[in-house]
A protein has these predicted regions:
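C-terminal auxiliary extensions adjacent to catalytic cores
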Residues: 1-22, 26-33, 37-45, 67, ...
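Glycine-rich, flexible loop motifs
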Residues: 3-41, 45-48, 78-134, 207, ...
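FAD-binding core of FAD-dependent oxidoreductases
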Residues: 52-66, 70-74, 81-104, 134-156, ...
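Conserved, non-catalytic sequence blocks in retroelement Pol enzymes and Pol-derived host proteins
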Residues: 110, 139-141, 376
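Membrane-embedded alpha-helical core segments of multi-pass
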Residues: 125-129, 147, 218
Length: 504
């Protein structure tokens, strides 16, 4: 049972709730902070003070003062009017991550929301009630307004939700789960809507997958190196100690472990006329390592965000101040997602170059053209490489940063926005493309190893080869490879090619 207290949540813990449905609960200490924060708001309402988000309109309409008898309707109107998302619904894991992240930051006690509203959100999460949240419509400032509005709408028993995978009216989903919808009181609608948790959920789960891919790339690259009769000399620790980037050194160690006890290497270690391998093989530590470093940096940013108050205004219980600021602005995440997208695309790029070397008879060290047993009669992996190129092209287009764009909204009041949700959605697509490109490389490299038999590759490579052959058999004759690619990509997502005991 995960305790929610506003602490930082690592990606692995978010994934555990989003994917494995680990239950959560609000920590006892957090309940006190929540109640104290709510007390400040109720005191403001009691003395009829003019405070943004409590007794005023929103955005450009912040100068409009709302009568005290209309404060609850104001919050309901906010949720309904902002529920204008567009497109396909976010996946259940993405919505679950979004609910987790929003509940966690609300427990910090800066939002002035009642404990029972957060408890309903947690109850929905634990009982698998997932609001239907369209994926498009957020510019990432003032937070993810439209997606979070759809989330809040379900708490009211309005809109739609999935219950155990079945789409229905939110009121029905809550009833089936044994939950009651809530009302909204002063500031509570705004407390639910102001935040970065939609982009955080989508981009965070994509980043979790990208970090896994950065390890899978080592496995695929090591297998390709063996199939191409490459050398591990470039991974010697002395080289990498001379340029001690942590990711580079870790990848070099990982590759050496994967390639340990290679019979293929022993067969050509002496008197090999080749001096050094191509960059796509020789520079794996430098490239894969840089990707690891980039993704690690992005993960640190998301960890900070997971325990940060992104509401506006913020309630401070030590002296009762309610201060307007801009913590809802998604710039930190938007820049991180763009960085992760570029890094993941580069990982795809070097993988595609290795696929080309495996299939190109002028470069593949004696392997048959396109890895076909009877080239000409058979086309082998010719079009599998073309598919990888198509995916890489899409990723390169999507790697253009979303965060450098800006369009003012709310009649110029909100004149700079992050476009973080766009960045998160792009990253998700790029990661999916990368999973498929690495699946193609694994399939092609395994096929190359078949032509090196009876010699065995390194112990780590052989383990990965055995795993792959449990998913996709050798291509003895031409067949449709789409199913093989899909199955291997799914195995990548499930962690079957992370590197086993050789993971570093």
């Amino acid at each position: 049972m995960m305790q929610l207290s506003g602490r930082r949540l690592p990606l692995a813990e978010i994934a555990q709730v989003a994917l494995a449905r680990e239950p959560v609960e609000i920590a006892a200490a957090a309940k006190k902070a929540i109640s104290a924060s709510r007390g400040v708001v109720e005191e403001i309402v009691a003395r009829r003070a003019i405070v943004y988000g409590v007794s005023t309109g929103f955005g450009k309409l912040a100068d409009v003062h709302i009568p005290s008898d209309k404060l609850e309707q104001l919050q309901v109107n906010l949720v309904r009017s902002h529920s204008c998302g567009i497109g396909r619904p976010l996946s259940a894991p993405e919505v679950r991550a979004m609910m987790l992240l929003r509940a966690n930051v609300l427990t910090l006690g800066f939002s002035g929301i009642r404990l029972e509203v957060i408890q309903l959100l947690v109850g929905m999460l634990n009982k698998n009630v997932c609001p239907v949240i369209p994926e498009k419509g957020s510019v990432g400032a003032s937070g993810d307004l439209a997606p979070l509005a759809h989330l809040a709408l379900s708490l009211l028993g309005e809109g739609e939700a999935f219950f155990n995978g079945e789409r229905m009216a939110s009121a029905s989903a809550l009833e089936k789960a044994g939950l009651q919808p809530t009302d909204l009181r002063a500031k509570e609608g705004l407390a639910l809507l102001n935040g970065t948790q939609a982009m955080h959920a989508v981009g965070g789960l994509a980043l979790f997958r990208a970090k896994r891919l950065s390890r899978v790339a080592d496995v695929a690259g090591a297998m390709s190196l063996e199939a191409l009769k490459g050398t591990p000399v470039a991974f010697d620790e002395r080289i990498h100690n001379a340029r001690p980037h942590p990711g580079q050194r870790a990848v070099a160690r990982h590759l050496l472990a994967l390639l340990r006890e290679s019979e293929i290497r022993d067969s050509h270690a002496k008197d090999d006329p080749r001096v050094q391998d191509a960059y796509s093989l020789r520079c794996m530590p430098q490239v894969h390592g840089a990707v690891r470093g980039a993704l690690g940096h992005c993960e640190e940013i998301l960890a900070i965000e997971s325990g940060s108050a992104t509401d506006n205004p913020l309630v401070f219980t030590d002296n009762g101040d309610v201060l307007s600021g801009g913590n809802f602005h998604g710039a930190p995440l938007a820049l991180a997602f763009d960085y992760a997208a570029i890094a993941t695309t580069d990982l795809m790029s070097i993988s595609e170059r290795r696929i080309d070397r495996l299939t190109n008879p002028d470069l593949n060290e004696g392997l048959p053209a396109f890895l076909a047993q009877h080239p000409g009669m058979q086309s082998g992996f010719m079009i599998a490489h073309v598919a990888a190129v198509a995916l890489l092209n899409e990723a390169k287009v999507l790697a253009h940063p979303a965060s450098v764009d800006n369009l003012p909204t709310s009649a110029g009041k909100e004149d700079h926005v992050s476009m973080g949700m766009t960045g998160a959605l792009k990253l998700r697509t790029i990661v999916e493309d990368a999973e498929n490109v690495l699946a193609i490389e694994l399939l092609a490299a395994a096929e190359g190893l078949e032509f090196r038999r009876p010699l065995k590759a390194g112990v780590g490579v052989e383990r990965a080869f055995t795993t792959l052959r449990g998913i996709a058999p050798r291509v003895d004759e031409d067949r449709a490879l789409s199913t093989d690619i899909e199955r291997v990509a799914e195995a990548i997502r499930n962690g079957q090619f992370d590197g086993g005991d050789d993971r570093l």
